[in-house]
Amino acid sequence: MASGETVPGRSKGIGVCAVDAVSGRITCSAMLPSTPNPSHLTMSTDRRFLYCVSELKEFSGISGSTVSAYAVEEGGARLRLLSRQATCGADACFVRLWHNEKWLLAANYSGGSVAVFPVEADHGLGPAACVLRHSGCGTDMRRQEGPHPHQILPAPDKIHVYVPDLGLDRLVCYRFDEEAGWLTKDGWQDIPGLPGQGIRHGVFRADGTRLYVMTEMAAQVNVYSYDPADGSAALLQTCDTVRGTAGKLGAAIRLHPSGKWLYASVRGADVLVTFGVDENGLLTEQSRIGSGGKIPRDFDLTPDGRFLLAANQDSDNLCVFEIDAEGNPHP
């Protein structure tokens, strides 16, 4: 497992950790100080290459963030830089490989843009092939004065891609041309949230018929019906993750591999919330537990669904939770 820091960062770079598949114990083996202020990262399917955005306002005198490509060597103990490219926007916060791993897409939060990079023969990155800037604003001028793309979410058809935009309260839809690396609008509709929710991240159910969206400002989860054939969506349900107004800063969202449970993290309240998923894809809150630290910015599940690993930003710690037979995490 590799983890990076976020603005304002206090660590030295990318940490490399191993998770014991039986006990869930984490062993951190290396800290690789080769990336300036690393934020979000992703790896190739074969785990031999790593891609990481640096959440920056400028780098080496050039406005905007960067994205770096590395070869993973010596069992993860060493990263060899293959290339570094400008993301053409400030505060890059998310990066994802396209399903064929020939393209990499990045979201620039403050830059209000999305960039597409070709993955070259050596698995490094070429300069951006496409950069699209969103326009508009939301209802809350403190947080939504302009567009703030926050994630890259491929649609189930592997042709379209959604970009959840906190500033616009919608998931912006594009068609992706995987031959040319271009994003275009083609008639598929954006998916709106509710005014002032601050859409952050989303996840599709395995069959593609339900979409779950975490909102940052409202700390709510929206459930949509979704038609993979034409991208049409309808809001079915909105679930609160916190009670009252304190600690209302939604963060990450994940579905259990079984599809039976959905998890959400909330910063400020510093909790992990578990929802049961019924046969219609609707949610019922099942449990909530402290994240084991402050500001659980992200978390993930092991591939077998046995453990949940939470990354607490302000307390600088990783916490492991074992998931019981009912889907509830326990430290």
State where each predicted segment sits:
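Residue position within the beta-strands of beta-propeller blades
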Residues: M1, Y51-V53, A106, V163, ...
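Short glycine/acidic-enriched loop and turn motifs that connect beta-strands
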Residues: G4-P8, E55-G61, S110-S113, L168-R170, ...
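Beta-rich, blade/repeat-based domains predominating
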Residues: R10, T35-T45, C88-H99, W103, ...
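Short loop/turn segments immediately following beta-strands, especially the blade-tip
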Residues: C17-G24, Y70-A77, V116-G126, Y174-L183, ...
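Blade-loop segments of beta-propeller domains
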Residues: T27-E101
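A short beta-strand motif characteristic of beta-propeller blades
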Residues: T27-P33, R80-Q85, C130, G136-R142, ...
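Structural preference for solvent-exposed beta-strand-turn elements
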Residues: Q85, F94-D177, P192, A269, ...
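Loop-centered beta-sheet repeat module
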Residues: K158-A219
